[in-house]
């Protein structure tokens, strides 16, 4: 009997997963719009989502080129703690980057004044370094230092974790950001300064039983979304997971067979690449096919520079179908048209991709809300299944 009890406890321990609840909040874009600042922001900042994946120049060893405009539309945020005792921060869990950074008490910029700031002197486990970090965006850059401390995430105590502490945050637009910092979940190969990403550090310490994490994004206005470290919860999806090999280990990049509408190819006719990115809100692709899609769905530009459609037309619009590894993944108009403040905004966004990189798409939250997603580091693959 004792052995049966022991075996049962071992089996239970192997099934333990760590969930981080995500809360859906108003995006930075919406905050700027409500304060009458969006048009001016878009005018001053040459916003190209591709800059997240294709920095204009190779960065020095301790520089992280991570344009912050890419988080303009983010709505899902979770809480982590850093230090002993823990200091709480609201962060984006971003599979499109690999570094962790938060504001620090050394930052006196306007953008830092209304956000949580890490104080190293209040943590008994903080270790300083001589490293620096610079996170470029728009016309300025966020600069800071690198340090080590314990990170609390989903009930996990991730010790000796390297992270960035911002010292300057130029640009008043970050004042309206609904998040404090970023927690990157991509591969270590794209991590600035060779810093070990949070999930890698967690796995290396044996704090999760499986070398994978998964994401469920709810369409609910407030709650229900989660990041799951070390496991998969089948209650979040229907059917079975379909697995797609990672084509390039850096971002969570996969191969796409085609993108169709009404049975006809509208992009990616010869196959293309896509990055599955929780740190991008929209469905993003090369400028030309995106322009064609906007035209096909009847989208036109409003005074804020957003592409909008008639809300009454949504029910008559077709699905956009991504065929990946032989499986069709339809995205219905109810998913790719975003309703906000009485407007219906297209969930597609164009980006200027370097021509030598081929046709690249970003499958952001518009896609992930439809499909429970598993990021499997052990087997370098992505699992997809329709959400429950």
Swiss-Prot record:
Peptidase A1 domain span: 76-385
Family annotation (InterPro entries): Aspartic_peptidase_A1, Aspartic_peptidase_AS, Aspartic_peptidase_N, Pepsin_A, PEPTIDASE_A1, Peptidase_aspartic_dom_sf
This protein's GO CC annotations: extracellular exosome
Entry annotated with the keyword Repressor: no
Disulfide bond annotation, renumbered to this chain: 107-112, 268-272, 311-344
EC number: 3.4.23.1
Gene Ontology BP annotations: digestion; proteolysis
Localization annotation: Secreted
Entry's Gene Ontology molecular function annotations: aspartic-type endopeptidase activity
Reactions catalysed according to its record: Preferential cleavage: hydrophobic, preferably aromatic, residues in P1 and P1' positions. Cleaves 1-Phe-|-Val-2, 4-Gln-|-His-5, 13-Glu-|-Ala-14, 14-Ala-|-Leu-15, 15-Leu-|-Tyr-16, 16-Tyr-|-Leu-17, 23-Gly-|-Phe-24, 24-Phe-|-Phe-25 and 25-Phe-|-Tyr-26 bonds in the B chain of insulin
Pfam families: A1_Propeptide (PF07966), Asp (PF00026)
Acyltransferase in keyword set: no
Major location (coarse): secreted
Annotated function: Shows particularly broad specificity; although bonds involving phenylalanine and leucine are preferred, many others are also cleaved to some extent.
Misc. remarks from the entry: The expression of pepsinogen genes is regulated by hormones and related substances.
Entry protein name: Pepsin A-2/A-3
Source organism of the structure: Macaca fuscata fuscata
């Amino acid at each position: 009997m004792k052995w049966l009890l022991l075996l049962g406890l071992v089996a239970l321990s192997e099934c333990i997963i760590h969930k981080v609840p995500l809360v859906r909040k108003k995006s930075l874009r919406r905050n700027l719009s409500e304060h009458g600042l969006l048009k001016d922001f878009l005018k001053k900042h040459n916003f190209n989502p591709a800059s997240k994946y294709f920095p204009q120049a190779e960065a020095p060893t301790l520089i992280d080129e991570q344009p912050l405009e890419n988080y303009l539309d983010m709505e899902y945020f979770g809480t982590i703690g850093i230090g002993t005792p823990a200091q709480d921060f609201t962060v984006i869990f971003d599979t499109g980057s690999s570094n962790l950074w938060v504001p620090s008490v050394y930052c006196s910029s306007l953008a830092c004044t209304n956000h949580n700031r890490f104080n190293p002197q209040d943590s008994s486990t903080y270790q300083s370094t001589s490293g620096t970090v610079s996170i470029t965006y728009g016309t300025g850059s966020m600069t800071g230092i690198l340090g080590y401390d314990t990170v609390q995430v989903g009930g996990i105590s991730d010790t000796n974790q390297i992270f960035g502490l911002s010292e300057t945050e130029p640009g008043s637009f970050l004042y309206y950001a609904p998040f404090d910092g970023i927690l990157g979940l991509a591969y270590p190969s794209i991590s600035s300064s060779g810093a070990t990403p949070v999930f890698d550090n967690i796995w290396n310490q044996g704090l999760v039983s499986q070398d994978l994490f998964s994401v469920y994004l709810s369409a609910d206005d407030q709650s229900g979304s989660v990041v799951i470290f070390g496991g998969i919860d089948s209650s979040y999806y229907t059917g079975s997971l379909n697995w797609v090999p990672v084509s390039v280990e850096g971002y969570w990049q996969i191969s796409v067979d085609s993108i169709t509408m009404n049975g006809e190819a509208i992009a990616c006719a010869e196959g293309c690449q896509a990055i599955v990115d929780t740190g991008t809100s929209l469905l993003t692709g090369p400028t030309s096919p995106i322009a064609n899609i906007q035209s096909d769905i009847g989208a036109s530009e409003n005074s804020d520079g957003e592409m909008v459609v008639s809300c009454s037309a949504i029910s008559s619009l077709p699905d956009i179908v991504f065929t990946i590894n032989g499986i069709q993944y339809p995205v219905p108009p109810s998913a790719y048209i975003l309703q906000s403040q009485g407007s219906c905004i297209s969930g597609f966004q164009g980006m200027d991709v370097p021509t030598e990189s081929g046709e690249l798409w970003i499958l952001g939250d518009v896609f992930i809300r439809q499909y429970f997603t598993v990021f499997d580091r052990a087997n370098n693959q992505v699992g997809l299944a329709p959400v429950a």
